């Protein structure tokens, strides 16, 4: 049977993650209260942040920035918008 959580981001019952996606206490909090759907949305946003801000993930500061943004995205006031991103028009 699939594990379900009340997703803190989507504010609905949804399929839970299979394992903590990040180490430490933050990963545990995400595992317990974030759905697969919300995690997938974060991964897309994280990719935009990395690309638009030209982050080097070998740099400790870039990884700390992304961890802070991830915490804000799920448990705070929301992550930064990707600078320079223009949504596609139809």
Swiss-Prot record:
Keywords in alphabetical order: Iron
Keyword Cytoplasm in annotation: no
Cellular component annotations (GO), alphabetically ordered: cytosol
Keyword Iron part of the UniProt annotation: yes
Domain of life, source organism: Bacteria
GO molecular function: iron ion binding
Gene Ontology process terms (BP): cellular response to oxidative stress
Alphabetical list of PANTHER family matching this protein: FE(2+)-TRAFFICKING PROTEIN-RELATED
UniProt family annotation: Belongs to the Fe(2+)-trafficking protein family.
Function: Could be a mediator in iron transactions between iron acquisition and iron-requiring processes, such as synthesis and/or repair of Fe-S clusters in biosynthetic enzymes.
The name this protein goes by in its record: Probable Fe(2+)-trafficking protein
Organism encoding this protein: Herminiimonas arsenicoxydans
